[in-house]
Amino acid sequence: MGARASVLSGGELDRWEKIRLRPGGKKKYRLKHIVWASRELERFAVNPGLLESSEGCRQILGQLQPSLKTGSEELTSLYNTVATLYCVHQRIEIKDTKEALEKIEEEQTKSMKKAQQAAADTGNSSQVSQNYPIVQNLQGQMVHQAISPRTLNAWVKVIEEKAFSPEVIPMFSALSEGATPQDLNTMLNTVGGHQAAMQMLKETINEEAAEWDRLHPVHAGPIAPGQMREPRGSDIAGTTSTLQEQIGWMTNNPPIPVGEIYKRWIILGLNKIVRMYSPVSILDIRQGPKEPFRDYVDRFYKTLRAEQATQEVKNWMTETLLVQNANPDCKTILKALGPAATLEEMMTACQGVGGPGHKARVLAEAMSQVTNPATIMMQRGNFRNQRKNVKCFNCGKEGHIARNCRAPRKKGCWKCGKEGHQMKECTERQANFLGKIWPSYKGRPGNFLQSRPEPTAPPEESFRFGEETATPSQKQEQKQEPIDKELYPLTSLRSLFGNDPSSQ
């Protein structure tokens, strides 16, 4: 950390920490951004010590700028950080990153005009190529510098560690900037393993070379003196062309960028290989219930790199699928932010979602909303929200129940008005075992014990002084009663059900 922190002096560090990340934003540059930029440069096999001077920052910008259109968001952030650091070294007054990029663009435009003017003054209208590894020596000749072992080592290390994951493509693009077809073949030949993938890459290159030959047929007739022959597909692939021919095509007027053409073919084949090594579709990337949003975004963009689609389609996937495939907690937050939210705002808003702190906040908000019994009834499914008017059994008034009644307690049953029992023991209008209401005028229902108390007064016959002659039918009934009492005692079924109404 100490070596990286020495990039800026005291006064430069003060100016650095006053620059805003975005126009009108609150966040400003800090020392951690320089540390992050140093680590990213080490990943791309670039010396982080170049950040200590404005000239070193200019060299880094020259290498990163051609990859901005096809690079990832991390590459764009790295370019913006180095551009801002360059302005600090040059003591250029800026307020935010946008102004730094504008200053860089102005300087590049001025330098380009100066180079064109110098070329016009010397009678050479062609622009001087400064792309590595083709450089101009002191005699003005275009010479080739072989690709460095350090670059090859970085490329081999990436293949060994990452195999053919999506980040291999931008790494290859950065390491092969300005390379000739011979340099590109050297990089491909250093790959020892993964021969199946390399065979697929060769097939893709052969297909693209055949397509080039079909679209660019050879012109009939001899070649004019002083002119070079037109490259064929095999010449672009470096199999039938020499290094001097490749340099001549790349520096000719007008130039034929055989190195860039061959590089596009290789990247096209690498995309197919990455697709084979990463069979997961972007549609299958979904956030787990307890997965942090940051890890989900990392998986999403890693899979998005492997998608063979245009930048417009990838932008649509990012705007739509990133929110759609998030878990319910994060999706609620992201929809509340709106469609214009940046990735930084999304990650800040969803930070900590799924953890114990977030669950406690959600529970507290839910409990704070439930403040009255009506809300609880709504949550339990009682959507009628209608309260029945209660009636007191004691006084007969509405608005309260008998438990809270202030009137004197009424004696007897609150249902039938009779004394001797309570309302819960009342049998008035009670259904029998058949589910029918027993009429009150018939006495106790049939499903109750038919307890008939014996009369205490003497029978009517004892008050009569003269005996009346009984009819034969009355005698028969008197004989039948003792028999019934013997056959059907009080505890029998007949005493339970009484006289059967259906037999009467």
UniProtKB/Swiss-Prot annotation:
The modification Phosphoserine is found at S148. Residues 476-487 have a biased composition (Basic and acidic residues). A motif (Nuclear localization signal) lies at residues 26-32. One of its GO terms (molecular function) is RNA binding. A motif (LYPX(n)L motif) lies at residues 487-496. Transmembrane segments: none annotated. A lipid is attached at G2 (N-myristoyl glycine). GO terms for biological process: viral budding via host ESCRT complex; viral translational frameshifting. InterPro entries: Gag_p24_C, Gag_p6, Lentvrl_matrix_N, Matrix_HIV/RSV_N, Primate_lentivir_Gag_pol-like, Retrov_capsid_C, Retrov_capsid_N, Retrovr_matrix. A zinc finger (CCHC-type) spans 390-407, 411-428. Residues 277-363 are annotated as: Dimerization/Multimerization of capsid protein p24. Residues 217-225 are annotated as: PPIA/CYPA-binding loop. Residues 106-128, 444-504 are annotated as: Disordered. Gag-Pol polyprotein: Specific enzymatic cleavages by the viral protease yield mature proteins. Capsid protein p24 is phosphorylated possibly by host MAPK1; this phosphorylation is necessary for Pin1-mediated virion uncoating. Late-budding domains (L domains) are short sequence motifs essential for viral particle budding. They recruit proteins of the host ESCRT machinery (Endosomal Sorting Complex Required for Transport) or ESCRT-associated proteins. p6-gag contains two L domains: a PTAP/PSAP motif, which interacts with the UEV domain of TSG101 and a LYPX(n)L motif which interacts with PDCD6IP/AIP1. This is Gag polyprotein. It comes from Human immunodeficiency virus type 1 group M subtype B (isolate JRCSF).
